[in-house]
Amino acid sequence: MYKKITHDIVEEHFDHPMASQLKHQMDNKKLIPKLSSYYIGSDYSVGLNDPLPQYVLNENTMLFRMDCRTAWNKWVYSLLNYSVSLNGNLPGTDQVKGRMHKNAVAIGDMLIPYYGPTAGKLVGTSLIAIDDIGMHYVEALKNNEPTEEIVASWVPFVNDFAKILNELNPNNWPAALITDILLAVVKAWQDQLTARAVGDIIADEIAIDLIAKLVVTGIPDHGKGFDSLADVFSRGIIAQFPSMFQD
């Protein structure tokens, strides 16, 4: 015999100021154009594991990939700059914070020629939300406050970012890959910021080096190959729109 059992479940979530805006954007499917509108007919787009066509291996493509590395490098290290400015009580802390948001917007703007302004804004907004949680983490460390809730709040925003990229380019930006890299970046941020706060110079340097590998240079001699977040980002665009990268 069975009997019906009713449970009352209460969920608590970190109240990040960007949460309601991002939720609205993710729920409103009209904000993300249909994938079919991104492909340019028979443009010979390729997937993550396919070789790029020879005609895109040119100087313009190389410069684009370097520009992407520069943009992601500025973004990922802007949180560390904020930590230095805040903990040093420097007068330009507000400007550093604004620059962090500007760097996030710049990455979104790189998508506009390929996916349109709505997608670019959505990516930039998602990165700003991830930034803001990082700033809360820095402030909590400075004030000797608990960080567990802040750390946990990063996960849904990382997942949202990965989902956005995957919807734009499912063949080259698998959600699991983007999530894996970005969560590793978040962990490296925590390690670096904590090490800096307690004066552990060696751990600080190790974390900074790992951040560079995860986001900019890639991990050399990795068994399965490990491209950086910047290279996955740029290669995905080139692979989806190869005709736009011909000489």
Show which residues each predicted segment covers:
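C-terminal amphipathic alpha-helix
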Residues: T6-L90, V96-M100, A104, H136, ...
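Mid-chain, structured segments of secreted extracytoplasmic proteins
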Residues: V105-Y137
